[in-house]
Structures are given as structure tokens and as C-alpha cells.
Amino acid sequence: MILKSFLLGNLLSLCMKIINSVVVVGFYYGFLTTFSIGPSYLFLLRAQVMEEETEKEISSTTGFITGQLMMFISIYYAPLHLALGRPHTITVLVLPHLLFHFFWNNHKHFLDYGSTTRNSMRNLSIQCVFLNNLIFQLFNHFILPSSTLARLVNIYLFRCNSKILFVTSSFVGWLIGHILFMKWVGLVLSWIRQNHSIRSNKYLVSELTNSMARIFSILLFITSVYYLGRMPSPIVTKKLKETSEMEERGESEEETDVEIETTSETKETKQEQEGSTEEDPSLCSEEQEDPDKLDETGRDPSEWKGNI
């Protein structure tokens, strides 16, 4: 009995040491970073669902993993974190990306030209898929921010003694989490494609493929608004701070004006009260003299002697 309790106590202590070890905690936080960013997965799912070519699927996966890796490194490397959050970086990344999308969506008829142009545009489309999945990860850092990504690591990093071991284990956990996520997405899509009930209804499949781009754009817009509502963009917060400061200044000026008006009104009322108190003694003296001079009938007492 004593031996069993001793073994049980040692086993529990060993389990507690393993759970509280830096490696396990690093695996845990690295695995949680897989689910910390939401909108960045939409381009990957769109490429996996809509693109039938394997090259585009591979390029989308590569761009997604590269962008996630840059985001993961920016947590631990402060210069990269500051560089991604600067307004010049936003201008350099966002404007060319939007212009390229505008040009690409309005010039799709170039794909119908000769074989050389078709091959070049095909390679360009593969590169475009890669850049979409790469750049959108960087957009999520400051345009669609998720505070979970930075807080997951900062909670434990300042308490950890062996930071290199923690970073390595969290990177391994992050990589395992993304591999599992990609495998899960592939299994779900393969099940949908192999399902006979879905494949038999060709009208439903054609309508779904035609409206897939619109569905993903709506989902992206809703998720973006949700994230921006929870944590506003740094581009907007500066203007909001300025407007709040102007409102506070206006409120303070209004309060001072109200105080000045109230003080002036109190001074006027005090002066009126003092003036009324000065007029009251004269009235009282006149009222005291009148009863001596006037009788109840209203006559003067000197008139009484004449009458007598």
C-alpha cells in the first residue's frame, strides 16, 4: 500500500513537471496560434475550393505558410513588428495590391490570346495566388488585427527563463497546428468532391462554383468588419483620438462658459438683494412717523383743537 502511494505520488509529480515544462507550454501556445487569425484563412479556402489546378493550390498553401511564418517571427522580433505596423508599409503593400487586383479583374480577356501569352499569364496567375495569400497575412497584422496572436506568447514569455527553448517548441507547435489544419481542409474538400449526392446534382454544383467568389467576398467583408469592430485600425485611431480631444476641449470650454455665467448671475442677484435691503429702512421710518400724525379717521391731530 505504501509502495503504491509512493509510485502514485512520483507519477503525479512527474506529470506536473511535464505539464509545467517549457516545451509543453511552447507546444500549447504554438498550437493555439493556428486559430488566432481568422480572415487570413479565407483566401486559402477560396484557392482550395475554386482552383482546380494543383499548382495554384500549392502556391496558395506556400504563400499562406510564408505569411504565417513572418507573422510568427514578428512576435519575437521587435524591428519586424515595428516595420509591419508603420504607415509607409501600409501604403507600399496595400495600394499596389489593390491596383493589381483592379487590373487583373478587368483584363481577363488577355488569357484568350496566343500560346506564349497564355503560358505567361498562367504563370502570372499562379504568382498572383501566392501573393494574395502572402500579403493578406501582413494585412491582418495592422488592418485586420487580432490581439490574440501577440497575447498568447507575451503571457508566458516574460516568465520563462529559457526563452530559446520556448520559442523553438512554440514554432514546432505552430507548424504542427498548421499541418493538421491543412490536412483537415484537404479531407473535407475531398469528401465533398467524392460525395455522390453532391456530384449528382450538377445544377447545384454549377451554381455553387459560380457564386463561390461572391460568397467568399461577403464572408471576408463580414469577418473584416467584425475584427475592426473589436480592435480598430491604427489608421483610424489617430483621427478618433484627435476628434475625441477636440470634443473634450469643446466640452471644457462650454463648462467654463457656464461657470462664468453662473458666477455673473450670482453677483447680480447679490447686488439686487443689497439694494433692496438699503431701501427698506427708509420705508420703515416713514411708516413709523405716519401713525403719530394720522388718526384712525385719517385726520391730523392739530385739526382737533380747532374744532374744539
UniProtKB/Swiss-Prot annotation:
Coiled-coil ranges from the UniProt annotation: none
Domain of life where this protein originates: Eukaryota
GO cellular component assignments: chloroplast inner membrane
Pfam family membership, one: Ycf1
Keyword annotations: Chloroplast, Membrane, Plastid, Plastid inner membrane, Protein transport, Transmembrane, Transmembrane helix, Transport
Region of interest (Disordered), residue spans: 239-308
Protein role: Involved in protein precursor import into chloroplasts. May be part of an intermediate translocation complex acting as a protein-conducting channel at the inner envelope.
Family as reported in the entry's similarity comment: Belongs to the TIC214 family.
Name of the protein in its database record: Putative protein TIC 214 N-terminal part
Gene assigned in the entry: TIC214
